[in-house]
Amino acid sequence: MDLGISGRGAAVAAASSGLGRASARALAAEGARVVICGRDRGRVDEAAADIGGGCVPIVCDVSDGEGGTRFVREATEVLGTVDLLVTNGGGPPPGTFAETALDAYPAAIDMNLMAVVAMCKAAVPSMVEREFGRVVSITSLAVRQPMANLILSNTARAGVTGMLKTLAREVAGSGVTVNSVQPGLHRTPRVTQLYGDAPQDGMGDPDDFGQIVTFLCSEQARFLTGAQIHVDGGAYQALL
């Protein structure tokens, strides 16, 4: 199936490893022109080489709004236009409500909410002008089922989900779609850090996840917007 994204400019945030890298690799395989970012020069260069397809690496920390804006600006300079935006970022430190200090919350909100707001602010207006664009935000299953010992992530990611659904409605009919993908446990460095003892055979393959992100960026997904796609091997069982 031709997904209709060959030649499109794709900016994938925080793609040195894990689900961001897998998403960038899947987009590049479909012929998208991909720019990625990461904080470490060596790691982001290695990721770009692995992704292939002329992927361009940018050293940029998207853990706050300023970094998110800079990434989209620099990606636009490379690509000409950002047609496909995949927002992604690391999670804040684990911890319970009782042990997490009040002053830890602003950094978590910057990382998992404001960085996404900033990337969308920088990319979406020109998408609307061109009457085409795809925003796919990699969030977390925690927005449906809060995860134990992740109070900061649970709090911030719920906010970004509300923002994305509101934005999807505001740009509906303009040729721009906005969706989020909510991963359960996948075999990534972040999951290994948090759940090192969990059996690996019960986790998802990041490359499969990347294919879902890529479909959401496709021409065929033009009528799919405001959706929250949970990719968790059936772990989330609620009816609503």
Where are these regions (language model features)?
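Conserved glycine-rich cofactor-binding loop
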Residues: 9, 16-17
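Substrate-binding pocket helix/loop in short-chain dehydrogenase/reductase
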Residues: 96-97, 104-109, 135, 191
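Short, small/polar-rich loop/turn modules that mediate ligand/substrate recognition or access, typified
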Residues: 86, 172, 177, 224-226
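Short C-terminal tail/terminal secondary-structure segment
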Residues: 145, 214, 225-240
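Active-site helix of classical SDR
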Residues: 120, 156-157, 164
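Alpha-helical segment proximal to the catalytic Tyr-Lys
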Residues: 125, 169-170, 222
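Residue(s) in the substrate-gating loop at a strand-loop-helix junction
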Residues: 140
